[in-house]
């Protein structure tokens, strides 16, 4: 997949996968490294370094809005959603924006988010994680270490209730 292209699996809620630019990734990392405001008390992660961004609206939203517009376009045109279910133009209100610096043996358990849409970006992924993932897939009956999994509904016969994959650096997922 190339920057600007996207793909989403057909199951439950619409999940849009795309790739963010290197400059956006770097800005998020640079600003994330500046903040040291601990945010663990608000998050589900079993991660030691989870920090909330401060004063991000002016630089973040201009970069992020085109992704929301792509989500809206795909919801209406590819997914068959109704325009009435998405307010236009977008009224963007954010609760918080945070960054996780996740290390070996740390993880995010299954959890949910508030709001109409949520997203996750993978800004930096160690090469060793892909190797570890490949090794563990040969031993265990799962997709291995470092994956992200989206759930929707019940696990019933002939029903795809989840999607799981190992993300790449720069991947972003937006979901309802």
Name what the model sees in each region.
Residues 1-91, 96-98, 102-108, 144-147:
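Non-heme Fe(II)/2-oxoglutarate
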Residues 96-174:
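Catalytic core of non-heme Fe(II) oxygenases with the double-stranded beta-helix
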């Amino acid at each position: 997949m190339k920057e600007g292209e996207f793909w989403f699996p057909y199951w439950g809620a619409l999940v849009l996968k795309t790739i963010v630019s290197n400059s956006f990734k770097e800005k998020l990392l640079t600003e994330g490294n500046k903040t040291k405001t601990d945010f663990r008390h608000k998050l589900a992660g079993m991660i030691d370094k989870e920090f909330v961004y401060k004063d991000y609206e002016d630089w973040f939203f201009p970069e992020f809005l085109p992704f929301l517009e792509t989500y809206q376009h795909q919801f209406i045109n590819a997914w068959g959603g109704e325009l009435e279910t998405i307010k236009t133009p977008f009224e963007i209100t954010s609760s918080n924006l945070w960054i996780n610096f996740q290390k070996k043996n740390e993880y995010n358990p299954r959890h949910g988010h508030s709001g109409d849409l949520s997203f996750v970006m993978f800004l930096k992924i160690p090469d060793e994680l892909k190797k570890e993932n490949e090794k563990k897939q040969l031993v265990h009956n799962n997709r291995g270490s470092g994956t992200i999994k989206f759930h929707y509904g019940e696990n019933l016969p002939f029903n795809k209730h989840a999607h799981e994959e190992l993300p790449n650096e720069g991947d972003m997922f937006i979901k309802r």
